[in-house]
Structure formats: structure tokens, C-alpha cells
């Protein structure tokens, strides 16, 4: 059993800055290495670990979430059986390491090398939590769905751009320009349809995901986008099992803002949530106000009480979240209660 080392990785598109910290001192001279962010670079990481006398069973890696840039490194770490943890960039930004007199450079210098040392010190401070709850890549189906739903959003955004141009500028454009824009919009709609078809194929290949998808789509207003998005974010309701926790994650849970005698901000939703999921829930809520009798009655009742529209809409979003988690917990499709009241 070798000594325990805490290794921080600053991930970028081209390379990885890697530094280790032993919990006592920072080895400025030999404690850092830069490698390419590809397979050849990962082999260099293994050689570097051997050079500094680190046992792979005694090292703890830590890195920030950087999307696709850290995907290959995470796969390599899991193949090698190395424990690692992922940290939010917001947490790293607020992290204040306990620095000695010879480590003050970490406070003053902003480079990739210094960032890797800061991440290593964060890893040491939170090592117990990382070892008890190590990060793992989700199943390949979630990764495929995540990329497909991102592709669909790009097509929808481009289509909205051209639609706005046709509406606002068609009177000033030539006939050829209008024709080309309409052709592009037609092509984008076709790509959206093809992307959705591929999403459905990926969903149908996994029985557990397919079951959850069908249950979610039984809820009024919930379609392919919101159902798939919820399955991805919760990893099919295994990573997040509590509806209140999910509401907090997407930013629809009200939070208090108070300090002393002067600051009394009241309850407001946080801006730190996953805003895309929050926006998609807004679309579902507006649909439910028009189509769902219970939601419509709730909206009218609260409006009559003088409640602000945004507050009511946020409450409806939470009702939809509760419905999604309820159908998964009960493993039964959603049933509209009003249909049995006649």
C-alpha cells in the first residue's frame, strides 16, 4: 500500500494539466505535468504516476465538469480502476484552500497549472466524500440521448431564426432569398423529425428507459423532449429519486434570501438551476393550463386570489414534476381524475 496522493486535473480541449498534492506540501518542481487530451496522453499519465511513485490504488483524481472534453479521460480512469470525482466549476470558483506561506501563489496567479494544484487541494479536502461517492459515467444510452437532444435543440434554434427572418424581413428580401430560407426551414424540420426518430430507437433498445418514457408521456403536456430530458438528468430516476431535489436542481424551488435586519428578499427561485429544463417545463405548464381541467381550475383560482402569474406558473411546474415522479414510483400511467367524476 503506497502513500495516498490527491490529483487535480484541469481539462481543456487540447491538453490536460495534472498536479498532485500529498496533503502536506505542494511539490512545485515535480508535482505538475501537461499531457495531450487523447489516448497517447493518458499513457503518459500512467508513466508519470510511476515516476512519482504513486500506486493507482492509492490515488484519487478530481476534475471539473467540462462536458465532452473530459469524456475520454473518465473512460480511461474507469478502465484503469482509478477512483475519481467530478466537481462543479462554481464550487471550485468559491473554494478557498488553506495556504501556507510558500503556497500564496495559488491565490495570486491564474494559470492552468495553478488551477490543477487548486483542484488537487480540493480533492484532498473532500477526499472522504469522493471515496464514498465516486463519480461514474452513466450508461451509453444516456450519453446518446443527451447528444441527440442537443442536436435537436440546435435545429429548432436555427429554424426559429429563419422563421423570424421570414416574418420580419421577407418584404425587403428578394424572391430567391425567401425561397432559399423556406428550403432551409423545410430541411431543418426534416432533420428534427429524423433526430426524434433516432431518439425513439435508442429509447426502445433499453427496456427500463422505454418503460419510464411511456409512463412520462402519459402525463398531459409531457412529450418526447421533456420525457427524454428528465430521464437523462435523473439517469432514469436513479441519480435523483426525490421530486423536491429535482425541483431544486432545475431551479423551480423557491429559496429565502435574508441577512440581518436589512435584507428581506422574500422567497424567490434560484437562477443557478438547469435553465433549459426549467424553460421546457414552462412550455408544458402553458399547455396544461389550456388542456388540463385540474391545472386550469388551479390557475383561475389563484388568479382570482390575486397571485402573480409567475408564482402560479412556477407552482404548476412543480405539480408536473410531482406527477412525473409519481407515475415512475407507482409504475402506472397517469390518470385524469376528473374523467371519473361524472
Where are these predicted regions, by residue range?
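Gly/Thr-rich phosphate-binding beta-strand-loop-beta motif of the actin/hexokinase/Hsp70
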Residues: 1-23, 119
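Short, glycine/acidic-enriched loop or turn micro-motifs at the edges of active sites
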Residues: 13, 67, 91, 232
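Nucleic-acid-processing active sites and adjacent nucleic-acid-binding tracks
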Residues: 25-56, 60
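Acidic, metal-coordinating catalytic cores used for nucleic-acid/nucleotide bond scission
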Residues: 62-73
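Long, charge-rich intrinsically disordered scaffolds of nucleic-acid metabolism proteins
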Residues: 75, 85-215
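Phosphate-backbone recognition surface of nucleic-acid-processing proteins
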Residues: 224, 230-305, 309
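Low-complexity, acidic/Ser/Thr- and charged residue-rich accessory regions of DNA metabolism proteins
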Residues: 261-262, 299-342
Amino acid at each position: 500500500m503506497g502513500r495516498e496522493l490527491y490529483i487535480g486535473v484541469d481539462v481543456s480541449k487540447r491538453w490536460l494539466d495534472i498536479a498532485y498534492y500529498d496533503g502536506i506540501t505542494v511539490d512545485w518542481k515535480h508535482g505538475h505535468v501537461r499531457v495531450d487530451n487523447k489516448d497517447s496522453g493518458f499513457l503518459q499519465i500512467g508513466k508519470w504516476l510511476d515516476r512519482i511513485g504513486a500506486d493507482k490504488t492509492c490515488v484519487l483524481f478530481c476534475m471539473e465538469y467540462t462536458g465532452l472534453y473530459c469524456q475520454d479521460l473518465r473512460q480511461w480512469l474507469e478502465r484503469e480502476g482509478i477512483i475519481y470525482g467530478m466537481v462543479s466549476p462554481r464550487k471550485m470558483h468559491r473554494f478557498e484552500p488553506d495556504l501556507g506561506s510558500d503556497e500564496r501563489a495559488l491565490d495570486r496567479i491564474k494559470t492552468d497549472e495553478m488551477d490543477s494544484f487548486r483542484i488537487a487541494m480540493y480533492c484532498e479536502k473532500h477526499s472522504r466524500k469522493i471515496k464514498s461517492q465516486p463519480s461514474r459515467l452513466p450508461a451509453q444510452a444516456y450519453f446518446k440521448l443527451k447528444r441527440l437532444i442537443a442536436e435537436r435543440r440546435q435545429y429548432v434554434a436555427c429554424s426559429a431564426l429563419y422563421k423570424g427572418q421570414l416574418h420580419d424581413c421577407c418584404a425587403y428580401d428578394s424572391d430567391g432569398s425567401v425561397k432559399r430560407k423556406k428550403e432551409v426551414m423545410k430541411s431543418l424540420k426534416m432533420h428534427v423529425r429524423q433526430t426524434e426518430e433516432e431518439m425513439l430507437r435508442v429509447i426502445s433498445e433499453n427496456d427500463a428507459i422505454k418503460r419510464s418514457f411511456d409512463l412520462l408521456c402519459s402525463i398531459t403536456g409531457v412529450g418526447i423532449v421533456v420525457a427524454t430530458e428528465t430521464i437523462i438528468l435523473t439517469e432514469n430516476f436513479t441519480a435523483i429519486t426525490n421530486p423536491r431535489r429535482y425541483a431544486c436542481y432545475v431551479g423551480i424551488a423557491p429559496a429565502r434570501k435574508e441577512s440581518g435586519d436589512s435584507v428581506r428578499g422574500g422567497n424567490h427561485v434560484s437562477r443557478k438551476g438547469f435553465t433549459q429544463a426549467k424553460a421546457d417545463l414552462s412550455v408544458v405548464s402553458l399547455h396544461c393550463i389550456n388542456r388540463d381541467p385540474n391545472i386550469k381550475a388551479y390557475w383561475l383560482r389563484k388568479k382570482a386570489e390575486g397571485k402573480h402569474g409567475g408564482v402560479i406558473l412556477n407552482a404548476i411546474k412543480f405539480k408536473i414534476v410531482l406527477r412525473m415522479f409519481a407515475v415512475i414510483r407507482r409504475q402506472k400511467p397517469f390518470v385524469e381524475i376528473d374523467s371519473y367524476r361524472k
